[in-house]
């Protein structure tokens, strides 16, 4: 189930979006004048088949109608167009990696928060990738932030020796809409077309799941050895993903991207 909208919390006088046992207890008291212990509230929530979970964050600016329109109208029309043109559809995204990033959880003695020692040299690298539902995966690593010029260079790498026309789904990052990008896309004479996802809806992009997998199973699980370069590690990990079409296809089975078809 989707989390209640912020207005629901605020209508009860709460200015945040986390249902804790204490908040539920207070709400029960407000509505029914019944005072329960924290333990009793926890038992009640468990009986309702509710569990404590780390929520996904979703921007307030998200437009549900635009999301639904993308899923029900825009994307199906894109699929039909690609079939007529004998073209391929890929989803594109960028992400950053850091050697000192901590993902996931670790076991430790109760009551003593573990400390992860970070390397003195904080290596960082960025990566871009494109993924399609049939299991194909393209990627590149780079340094620094994304500019229009760099995006064009990456697109040229993606298009190199590509025989079929390509429809590329991207987000609304300013670099993706730069004039130099528009000029390059126009120069391909229909070989490359960009399509923009609704704003504040990264969950519609299966490439986000690639990054989640890469970060969860990469340096976070196997820290860099002394002298090892992060960029080389990230490159090898992304290459392993590219070599595993079955894994790539699995990203498209996530409920958030179930609207995507071949």
Residue ranges of predicted features:
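RNase H-like polynucleotidyl transferase catalytic core
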Residues: 56, 113-121, 186-206, 222-223
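Acidic/histidine-rich, metal-coordinating catalytic segments
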Residues: 92, 155, 164-177, 200, ...
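A short, amphipathic alpha-helix used for macromolecular contacts
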Residues: 9-38, 83-85
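Short, small-residue-biased leader/transition segments that mark boundaries at the very start
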Residues: 1-8
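Extended, low-complexity cationic-aromatic segments
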Residues: 69-156, 259-262
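Short Lys/Arg-enriched helix C-cap and helix-to-coil transition segments
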Residues: 52-68
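Major-groove recognition helix of helix-turn-helix-like DNA-binding domains
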Residues: 37-48
């Amino acid at each position: 189930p989707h989390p209640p909208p912020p207005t629901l919390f605020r209508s009860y006088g709460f200015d945040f979006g986390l249902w804790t046992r204490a908040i539920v207890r207070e709400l029960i008291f407000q509505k029914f004048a019944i005072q329960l212990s924290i333990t009793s509230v926890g038992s009640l929530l468990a009986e309702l088949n509710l569990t404590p979970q780390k929520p996904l964050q979703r921007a307030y600016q998200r437009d549900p109608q635009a999301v639904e329109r993308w899923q029900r109208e825009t994307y199906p029309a894109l699929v039909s167009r690609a079939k007529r043109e004998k073209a391929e559809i890929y989803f594109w995204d960028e992400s950053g990696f850091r050697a000192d990033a901590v993902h996931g959880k670790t076991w430790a003695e109760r009551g003593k928060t573990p400390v992860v020692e970070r390397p003195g040299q904080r290596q960082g690298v960025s990566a871009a990738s494109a993924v399609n539902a049939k299991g194909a995966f393209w990627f590149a690593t780079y340094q620094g932030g994304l500019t229009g010029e760099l995006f064009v260079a990456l697109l040229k790498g993606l298009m190199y020796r590509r025989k079929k026309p390509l429809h590329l789904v991207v987000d609304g990052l300013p670099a993706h809409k730069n004039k130099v990008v528009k000029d390059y896309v126009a120069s391909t004479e229909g070989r490359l077309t960009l399509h923009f996802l609704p704003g504040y809806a990264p969950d519609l992009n299966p490439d986000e799941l690639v990054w989640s997998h890469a970060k969860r199973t990469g340096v976070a699980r196997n820290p860099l050895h002394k002298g090892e370069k992060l960029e080389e590690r990230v490159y090898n990990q992304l290459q392993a993903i590219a070599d595993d079409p079955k894994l790539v296809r699995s990203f498209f089975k996530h409920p958030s991207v179930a609207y995507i078809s071949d």
